[in-house]
Amino acid sequence: MTDLPILHVKNLGKADYQPVWQAMKDFTDGRDAHTPDELWLVEHPPVFTQGQAGKAEHLLAPGAIPVVATDRGGQVTYHGPGQLVAYPLLDLRRLKIGVRELVTKIEQSVVALLAEYKIDSAPKADAPGVYVNGDKIASLGLRVRKGCSFHGVAINVDVDLAPFNQINPCGYAGLNMTRLVDLVDTTKQPVVFSDVAKRYTRILSNILGLTAQLKE
C-alpha cells in the first residue's frame, strides 16, 4: 500500500460562518511547507455570502438573513443547515496542481458523490459548480493565498431551498437550485447527512491522492 500524504479531516458540526472564515485565513497564513493539508466539514446557520465579484443587485431581498462580504471567488450564495460545506485547505504547490485543476477535482468529487446515489450530474464550463438537469446542487468558490487554497464547496443535502429565492444564486437570475434528498428514493436509500459527509471525504481524498485522517 502506498503511503499517501495525510489529509486531516475536521468535523466542525454547526458553526457560524465568520469565525470559520477567520480560522481558515489564520490556518493558511500560519502554515508552512510541512503543514498537512486539511478538510473542514461544517454546516452554517443561515447566511448569504458575497464573493469578490459579488454585486448588490443580486441580493434581491435578504430579509433577516445576514449578509457577509467575503474574499472567495464568485458571486452571492446561501449557506444554511442541511447543506454540507467542505473547505479543502490545500498546499497546491506541494500537490502540483493549479487552481483550475483544483476546481475540476472538486467538481469531479461532487459528481462521484452523486453517482453513489444514482444521480447523473455534471459541471458547466462557464459556471463553476455541479448541476442536475440544469438545476444547481453544489456551489463552488475558492481563494488561493501563498499557493494554498481555502474556501470550498457547498453541497445541498436537505437544506431549505427557499432562501435561494431571495438572491440570484451565483449571479444568475432564475437559476433553479436542487438538493440531494429530492433526487433520491429515500425509501430505498436514506439520505443521512453524516453518511453524505463520510462519502464525500472518502471521494475527495481519493481524487486528491491523499489519505483522510480524522482530526479532533
Curated annotation (Swiss-Prot):
Q: Where in the cell is it found?
A: Cytoplasm
Annotated site, Lowers pKa of active site Cys, chain positions: K136
Sequence positions that bind substrate: R72, G73, G74, Q75, V76, T77, Y78, H79, S139, L140, G141, G152, V153, A154
- Swiss-Prot/TrEMBL GO biological process terms: protein modification process
| Domain BPL/LPL catalytic: start-end pairs | 33-212
Q: What class of enzyme is it?
A: transferase
Establish whether keyword Membrane is in the entry: no
Keywords attached to this entry:
Acyltransferase, Cytoplasm, Transferase
Under catalytic activity, the entry for this protein gives:
octanoyl-[ACP] + L-lysyl-[protein] = N(6)-octanoyl-L-lysyl-[protein] + holo-[ACP] + H(+)
Q: Record's family?
A: Belongs to the LipB family.
Query: What is the protein's name according to its record?
Result: Octanoyltransferase
**Annotated source species:** Saccharophagus degradans (strain 2-40 / ATCC 43961 / DSM 17024)
Q: What is the lineage of its organism?
A: Bacteria, Pseudomonadati, Pseudomonadota, Gammaproteobacteria, Cellvibrionales
Name of the encoding gene: lipB
